[in-house]
Swiss-Prot record:
F-type ATPases have 2 components, F(1) - the catalytic core - and F(0) - the membrane proton channel. F(1) has five subunits: alpha(3), beta(3), gamma(1), delta(1), epsilon(1). F(0) has three main subunits: a(1), b(2) and c(10-14). The alpha and beta chains form an alternating ring which encloses part of the gamma chain. F(1) is attached to F(0) by a central stalk formed by the gamma and epsilon chains, while a peripheral stalk is formed by the delta and b chains. Coiled coil: none annotated. GO terms for molecular function: proton-transporting ATP synthase activity, rotational mechanism; proton-transporting ATPase activity, rotational mechanism. Keywords: ATP synthesis, Cell inner membrane, Cell membrane, CF(0), Hydrogen ion transport, Ion transport, Membrane, Transmembrane, Transmembrane helix, Transport. PANTHER family: ATP SYNTHASE SUBUNIT B, ATP SYNTHASE SUBUNIT B', CHLOROPLASTIC. Its main location: membrane. Signal peptide: none annotated. Belongs to the ATPase B chain family. Gene3D superfamilies: F1F0 ATP synthase subunit B, membrane domain. This is ATP synthase subunit b. It is found in: Cell inner membrane.
C-alpha cells in the first residue's frame, strides 16, 4: 500500500472536517436534540400530572356529589318530619276546635232547652190558673168540671 500525499491530504482534510463538525455543528445538534427530549419529557410529565389531577378532580366531584346527596336526603327527612309535625299540630288544633264547638253547641242547646222549659212552665202555670178560674166559675156543675179538666189535659 502506498502512502502518498493525496492520502495524507485527504486524512488531514477529514480530520479538519471532523474537528469542525465536533466544534461547530455537533453542539447545536446535540442541544436541539436534548432540548427536544426535555420538551417531550416535560410534556409526558405534564400529561401524567393532568391525568392525576383529573382523577383527583373526579374523586373530589364524587365526594362532593355524595355529600350533596346526603345533605339533600337530610333536608328531605327534616322536611318530612316538619310536615308530620305540622299535620299533627293541625289535627290537634282541629280536635280542640271541634270539642270547643261541640261544647258550645251543647251549652246553647241546654240553655235553649231550659228557656223552653221555663216558657212551658209559665204557660202551664197560666193554663192551670185559667183552668182553676173556669173550674171555680163552674164548680157547681160536675159535668162542666170534668169537661174543663179534659180540655186542660188536652192543652197540656
Amino acid at each position: 500500500m502506498n502512502f502518498n500525499a493525496t492520502l495524507i491530504g485527504q486524512s488531514v482534510a477529514f480530520l479538519i472536517f471532523v474537528w469542525f463538525c465536533m466544534k461547530f455543528v455537533w453542539p447545536p445538534l446535540m442541544n436541539a436534540i436534548e432540548e427536544r427530549q426535555k420538551r417531550i419529557a416535560d410534556g409526558l410529565a405534564d400529561a401524567d400530572r393532568a391525568v392525576k389531577d383529573l382523577e383527583l378532580a373526579r374523586s373530589k366531584a364524587t365526594d362532593q356529589l355524595k355529600e350533596a346527596k346526603a345533605t339533600a336526603n337530610e333536608i328531605i327527612e327534616q322536611a318530612n318530619k316538619r310536615k308530620a309535625q305540622i299535620v299533627d299540630e293541625a289535627k290537634a288544633e282541629a280536635d280542640a276546635e271541634r270539642a270547643k264547638i261541640i261544647a258550645q253547641g251543647k251549652a246553647e242547646i241546654e240553655a235553649e232547652r231550659n228557656r223552653v222549659k221555663e216558657d212551658l212552665r209559665k204557660q202551664v202555670a197560666t193554663l192551670a190558673i185559667l183552668g182553676a178560674e173556669k173550674i171555680l166559675e163552674r164548680s157547681i156543675d160536675p159535668a162542666a168540671h170534668s169537661d174543663i179538666v179534659n180540655k186542660l189535659v188536652a192543652e197540656i
